Amino acid sequence: MLEDLELKDTPIVILNFKTYLESTGERALELASICGDVADETGVNMAVAPQHMDLHRVSDAVEIPVLAQHIDAVDAGGHTGSILAECARDAGAAGTLINHSEKRMQLADIEWVISRMKELEMMSVVCTNNVMTTAAAAALGPDFVAVEPPELIGSGIPVSRAEPEVITGSVDAVKKVNPEVSVLCGAGISTGDDMKAAVDLGAEGVLLASGIILADSPRDALLDLVSKV
């Protein structure tokens, strides 16, 4: 499934648009286009996770992978208000975030969505909060786990500086459990130094949001982010 996305042999940056007005509607298109341009200019893998209502328009506008922010563990049928995997796929999503700290899921539902992503040949990115949950998530066989200590999310304090042992411990744990799973890190990542430190600690990329979305110049912030990897 990842082979179909034609990811390069470089770190990956996944930008989560969350529900910021700065990354909604037309601004979602602008931000996704910036990510695509930076990916072309630098050779670093980029992916974006816009709000569900923007999935179709964003995926139509860019060549980089577009992910859903969440998919529910439901089949087609009577599940009003739920996000259906097939619907996200048909809207252009190449995969989904799972279990973000702002959208927690039960273990059985996490496993269900990962399995559904495999069936639909879509990418799965499971978010975790510490080494133990990262190891547990890796056992379920997603494509990526993204470890983010929740207290650092949006703080401007990078996990690679505040809690580097979370990254190294997660990388070591995943290698033991399922070496096919790639480890990302997030929480407070916003600069080139932050990302370089994360990669040096063993992460294969980053998941981030506000450090880019709320920057005075998202383009300049992205270029700085990938400038040292």
UniProtKB/Swiss-Prot annotation:
Pathway this chain belongs to: Carbohydrate biosynthesis; gluconeogenesis; Carbohydrate degradation; glycolysis; D-glyceraldehyde 3-phosphate from glycerone phosphate: step 1/1
Identification of the protein by name: Triosephosphate isomerase
Active-site residues, as the UniProt record annotates them: 100 (electrophile), 148 (proton acceptor)
Similarity annotation: Belongs to the triosephosphate isomerase family.
Catalytic activity: D-glyceraldehyde 3-phosphate = dihydroxyacetone phosphate
GO molecular function, one term: triose-phosphate isomerase activity
Entry keyword DNA damage: no
Gene source species: Methanothermobacter thermautotrophicus (strain ATCC 29096 / DSM 1053 / JCM 10044 / NBRC 100330 / Delta H) (Methanobacterium thermoautotrophicum)
Top-level class of the enzyme under EC nomenclature: isomerase
Assembly behavior: Homotetramer; dimer of dimers.
Major subcellular site: cytoplasm
Claim: Ligase is one of the keywords in the record: no
Family annotation (InterPro entries): Aldolase_TIM, TIM_sf, Triosephosphate_isomerase, Triosephosphate_isomerase_arc, Triosephosphate_isomerase_AS
Record-linked NCBIfam families: PRK04302.1, tim
Transmembrane segment boundaries: none
Cellular component aspect of the GO annotation: cytoplasm
Pfam families: TIM (PF00121)
EC nos: 5.3.1.1
Function: Involved in the gluconeogenesis. Catalyzes stereospecifically the conversion of dihydroxyacetone phosphate (DHAP) to D-glyceraldehyde-3-phosphate (G3P).
Single GO biological process annotation from the record: glycolytic process
SUPFAM superfamilies registered for this protein in UniProt: Triosephosphate isomerase (TIM)
Keywords: Cytoplasm, Gluconeogenesis, Glycolysis, Isomerase
Binding site for substrate: 16-18, 153, 188, 209-210
Subcellular location: Cytoplasm
